[in-house]
Amino acid sequence: AERHQVLISITGHIGDGNLHPGIIMDRRFPESVRRAEQAMAEIAREALNLGGTLSGEHGIGLLKAPFLEWEFGEAGVSLMRRLKRAFDPHGIMNPGKILGGGMAGVRD
């Protein structure tokens, strides 16, 4: 948090090891978003290096979406996109998020 000058809240389920970092940012300021992205990248990389995952029982979240390939590889994310298209051929379910837009929703 200090290194990136952001506030991070961490909630979770200690009994099963699920931690949910939440980075406080002001979307009106690109610098705030940039710092949040950098902090989340560091958190995601460390979680994966320690044998963890980017997401447990909750969704992936817009800040972690750009790091899906780190965990699942290009082939895994490509499969996710194909499944999304199969179940949502018209792109009406959560349009532009995660498999279609990544960080765009954070900046908008």
Please describe what each predicted stretch is.
Residues 1-108:
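Conserved glycine-rich FAD pyrophosphate-binding loop
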